[in-house]
């Protein structure tokens, strides 16, 4: 699933080519994605001018001069593809929704597994939307701090990995960036969240911010379906230190015999990757 850096990259690409433009034509080819499309979606979008873009967690918000906001979610394998004026759009049988602006710019949502979402809401009611209302703070925002994390985690008797994947704790994180941040912070993914001390909370906040900023600068991580709106791949997968690297050497360790490399752990059906030397297992915290 595209995580915060990928969604931020997509949002920025859309903003670059669509901000200030007027939607001339809208087409819905399949309305049965994760949720049904609004019945009046086409009528409310056609003729509207795009006035701004935002991202909340893994959701893209497109604000319109009509007072509405168009919400897009890429789901498990969705992507946005832009065609600029004069380009020939590349047909894709999994494109379920698209719109064109008056200058010929085309924006399509391609979603093979149909776990994505498209919705329309009054802009004034964004915070109360059912998909946004319970989200935690943005990890790159001011509210996300060592004090916030310490207070929230003190009540969590789950693993720190599970806590960080909970979108009510912090918004937008997923498996890749949680694994990378925990490695940088030196925290084992199976540690109980409530056992972290203040110094570890502070390191973790810093690690999350650093990983996300670096990933955004690299255009995200291209894993299977993800590409940027212009069709280019992201590059942060080349900077992964532990994710997907089980059996390979830890970049921060001297190697055997002290460390035999990155290990994989399954947690709640998801793979976690860690270095057993840099991230001491529970019960061996130094």
Curated annotation (Swiss-Prot):
Pfam families: Fapy_DNA_glyco (PF01149), H2TH (PF06831). It comes from the Bacteria. It catalyses: Hydrolysis of DNA containing ring-opened 7-methylguanine residues, releasing 2,6-diamino-4-hydroxy-5-(N-methyl)formamidopyrimidine; 2'-deoxyribonucleotide-(2'-deoxyribose 5'-phosphate)-2'-deoxyribonucleotide-DNA = a 3'-end 2'-deoxyribonucleotide-(2,3-dehydro-2,3-deoxyribose 5'-phosphate)-DNA + a 5'-end 5'-phospho-2'-deoxyribonucleoside-DNA + H(+). One of its GO terms (biological process) is base-excision repair. Belongs to the FPG family. The active site is at 2 (schiff-base intermediate with dna), 3 (proton donor), 58 (proton donor), 270 (proton donor). Involved in base excision repair of DNA damaged by oxidation or by mutagenic agents. Acts as a DNA glycosylase that recognizes and removes damaged bases. Has a preference for oxidized purines, such as 7,8-dihydro-8-oxoguanine (8-oxoG). Has AP (apurinic/apyrimidinic) lyase activity and introduces nicks in the DNA strand. Cleaves the DNA backbone by beta-delta elimination to generate a single-strand break at the site of the removed base with both 3'- and 5'-phosphates. It comes from Gluconacetobacter diazotrophicus (strain ATCC 49037 / DSM 5601 / CCUG 37298 / CIP 103539 / LMG 7603 / PAl5). Its EC number is 3.2.2.23, 4.2.99.18. Keywords: DNA damage, DNA repair, DNA-binding, Glycosidase, Hydrolase, Lyase, Metal-binding, Multifunctional enzyme, Zinc, Zinc-finger. GO terms for molecular function: 8-oxo-7,8-dihydroguanine DNA N-glycosylase activity; class I DNA-(apurinic or apyrimidinic site) endonuclease activity; damaged DNA binding; zinc ion binding. Monomer. PANTHER family: FORMAMIDOPYRIMIDINE-DNA GLYCOSYLASE. DNA binds at residues 94, 113, 156. This is Formamidopyrimidine-DNA glycosylase. Transmembrane segments: none annotated. Binds 1 zinc ion per subunit. A zinc finger (FPG-type) spans 241-280. SMART domains: Fapy_DNA_glyco (SM00898), H2TH (SM01232). Its cofactor is Zn(2+).
């Amino acid at each position: 699933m595209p995580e915060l850096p990928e969604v931020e990259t997509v949002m920025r690409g859309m903003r670059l080519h669509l901000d200030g433009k007027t939607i001339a034509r809208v087409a819905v080819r399949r309305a049965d994605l994760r949720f049904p499309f609004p019945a009046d979606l086409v009528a409310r979008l056609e003729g509207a001018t795009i006035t701004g873009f935002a991202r909340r967690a893994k959701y893209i918000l497109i604000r319109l001069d009509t007072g509405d906001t168009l919400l897009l979610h890429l789901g498990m394998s969705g992507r946005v593809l832009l065609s600029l004026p004069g380009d020939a759009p590349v047909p894709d049988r999994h494109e379920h929704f698209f719109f064109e602006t008056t200058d010929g710019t085309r924006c399509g949502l391609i979603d093979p597994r149909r776990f994505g979402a498209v919705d329309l809401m009054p802009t004034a009611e964004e915070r109360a939307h059912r998909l946004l209302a319970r989200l935690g703070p943005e990890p790159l925002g001011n509210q996300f701090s060592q004090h916030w994390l310490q207070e929230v985690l003190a009540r969590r008797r789950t693993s720190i990995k599970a806590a960080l994947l909970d979108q009510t704790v912090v918004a937008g994180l997923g498996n890749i960036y949680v694994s990378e941040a925990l490695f940088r912070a030196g925290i084992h993914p199976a540690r109980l969240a409530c056992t972290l001390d203040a110094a570890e909370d502070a390191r973790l906040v810093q690690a999350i911010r650093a990983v996300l900023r670096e990933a955004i600068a690299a255009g995200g991580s291209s894993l299977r379906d993800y590409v940027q709106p212009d069709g280019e791949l992201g590059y942060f997968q080349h900077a992964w230190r532990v994710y997907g690297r089980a059996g390979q050497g830890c970049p921060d360790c001297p190697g055997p015999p002290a460390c035999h490399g990155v290990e994989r752990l399954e947690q709640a059906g998801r793979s976690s990757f860690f270095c057993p030397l840099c991230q001491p297992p529970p019960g061996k915290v130094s």
